Amino acid sequence: MKSKGNSTFWCLVGIFLTGALPLFTNYCLNSAEVPYQLVRIENMKDYLSAGIFQMAMPVNWQYEHGTAGLDGNLFWLLPALLRMTGATLESVYRMFLVCIYAVTVCLSCKALAEGFPGKKIALIGTALYCWAPWYLDTLYGRAAIGEALGYAFLPVMLLFLVRAVSRKQGKLPQWLLLAIAVTLLLQSSFAVLEVGMLLLIFCCIYYRRQLLGKEGWLTLGKAVVATLVCNLWFLLPLLRYLVAYRDVARYVGSRPFQEKGAFLLHYLTFFLRGGATYDYKSNGLLDTAAIGVGPALTGLFFFLLWLKFSGVLQKKNSKEDSTAGLFWCGMLGILLSLGSFPWDWLRQNAVFQILTFSMQSPVIFMILAICGLTFMGCGLMKDYRQRKSATEATILEAAVIAVAFVATQFLTNKLLLDRAPLWIRQKEDLPDVVLVEASQFQMSAAAGATQWGAVMISTLGIAGIIIYCIIVRKKDTKQKVRKEAA
């Protein structure tokens, strides 16, 4: 048993090392938004030294999108505090990315292990999720760290859905798990939060018997209350910020959006070379972002179609299985991510302008495709192992991991070979990036009574939830002991 646990650990280490290859240098890759992120860390460090905590990223509204103004700075305390100790800016940035990627590996493995108890399939699924070209490009190619953070925490939402659909109970109550998932996304990236909410809504409709029954509504209600209370300290200034910049948000939301969507070609291309933009209208695929779900997931999808149409796979979808719902949500994600989807027509409406102004491109919906196809692939490998011999199943699994590994090596090596280093030896070396101050997001001793009141409510709410969970857990333990004694 101990040996099996050790093998799982070393497999996760291998997955991490393969995807984190660009971080094992002594410099930062000069990617699209790296200068902005470095200035963000330095700016946050300076404010902390002055006794001010910036709750969200300052925004330059001249950029293509306004998502930065809604991305929380809570997790950015880690690099900022490390920077205050005297560590170099490049090292704290790379360490932050190491932490993000490690969290992605651990949380995705946890979610997949819950849905697929076989460790081997869960590990392969973890590799497929963590080695997705979209994610690697987001981390290293574009350096959209907010989106990468959201992607790292999205498996917590998947874990909630897997348990809810299969009616499993974990150590945490379902309502608390959902509240934690939403909170993590809220503090990471507003755009990924919206994608996560779409995932939740779709699964609630698809699995309405499990998620929208009496117990389901109670779980959702508790999660909403817990999320609002625990994040009131952030949501209150966020609302004030949106009200103050509502006209600008609508203006950003009315800009051309559809032309930055993906081609169907992106889901069929095997080897991608990381670029910097989504400007497909002007550049075609030249120097554009390396987006896609990866050749392994594409191959598994076509293998599934072959098995279905050849009559080999006749299994009907079960409403107790989360794979089918997530697969169809992934198909929706593919549709929404395409440049042929009528986004510009929809964004003529003020509601869609507000909902999508925080998104740089429809490609953000590719996250749903990655999640759906990953669960589909794991479900397919699980079913194939049950129907075929162990040798045939092992060949399929080995082929999947080999294709994913080669494609990942190709992309990470191209990023390393094509990107120049960015050296920051002193503050004067930082690029000239203009940050627009947002007074609504500045927390200091001089903050108003309303803001400090929200902080107090959130603090008491978090403390109350912890105490409640401890009491309930002790009560359940006593009841379990009594039943065993009886």
Residue ranges and their predicted role:
Residues 85, 135-149, 251-258, 332-372, ...:
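Membrane-helix boundary/interfacial segments in multi-pass membrane proteins
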Residues 229, 291-319, 326-327, 331-332, ...:
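Hydrophobic, aromatic-rich transmembrane alpha-helices
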Residues 19-116, 120-153, 184-185, 191:
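Active-site lumenal/periplasmic loops and adjacent helix-entry segments of GT-C-fold
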Residues 1-22, 393-402, 462-486:
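Start-transfer (signal-anchor) and selected internal transmembrane alpha helices
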Residues 41-42, 148-167, 181, 199-200, ...:
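Specific aromatic-rich, kink-prone transmembrane helix
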Residues 210-220, 303-344, 388-392:
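Membrane-interface helix-loop-helix junctions at transmembrane boundaries of multi-pass membrane enzymes
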Residues 160-184, 214-221, 392:
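Short hydrophobic alpha-helices at membrane interfaces in multi-pass membrane enzymes
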Residues 219, 224-309, 333, 418-454:
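Periplasmic/ER-lumenal interhelical loops and adjacent helix-loop junctions
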